Regions:
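C-terminal anion-handling pockets and recognition modules
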Residues: 1, 118-150
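Mobile genetic element proteins and their domesticated derivatives, centered on retroelements
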Residues: 3-5, 42, 68, 85, ...
């Protein structure tokens, strides 16, 4: 079974924790500026990330179907089960047709159930790593690639 998901990332990610004297509330200033966000998409199979793609545009059905057919499908063994969430661009019309044409099957996760998708933990770990180390990189793409290749 291969789990597929996408996540948004940005270079300037705010820390989740900080230090203050006991009893003193900690505040952090954040800019109101729009920050460039990139998206990451991949498959997760037996602890391995497959068909990792980092891109600077929004995901739509057409683009997702192209990535699915030309990047992910060629990496799968015949008869694989592909598990997807219910994102609007995961076309329930086209994706099953593409998967079945290559001998695969799609299972849909119930709505609002990220806890059933193990790749969500991969994204959480990636974002924790990026909060600590993305400042050392010129762009988010090189930071994400370095995270997955170290």
């Amino acid at each position: 079974m291969i789990y597929v998901d996408e996540s948004g990332v940005q270079k300037e990610m705010n820390p989740l924790r900080g230090r203050a004297k006991r009893g003193v509330r900690l505040y952090q200033e954040t800019s109101g500026k729009r920050i460039k966000r990139d998206n990451v998409i991949a498959g997760y199979l037996n602890g391995l990330i497959l068909a990792l793609c980092i891109f600077a545009w929004s995901t739509d059905t057409e683009w997702f179907c192209e990535w699915f057919e030309y990047s992910l499908i060629p990496l799968l063994k015949p008869g694989s089960v592909i598990i997807l969430d219910n994102a609007t661009f995961h076309s329930k019309v086209y994706l099953p047709v593409i998967a079945e044409a290559y001998g695969h099957k799609i299972l849909w996760l119930p709505k609002y159930s990220p806890d059933l998708n193990p790749i969500e933990h991969v994204w959480a770990n990636m974002k924790t790593w990026l909060r600590n180390y993305s400042k050392n990189y010129l762009n988010i793409k090189s930071a994400v690639l370095d995270h997955f290749h170290t």
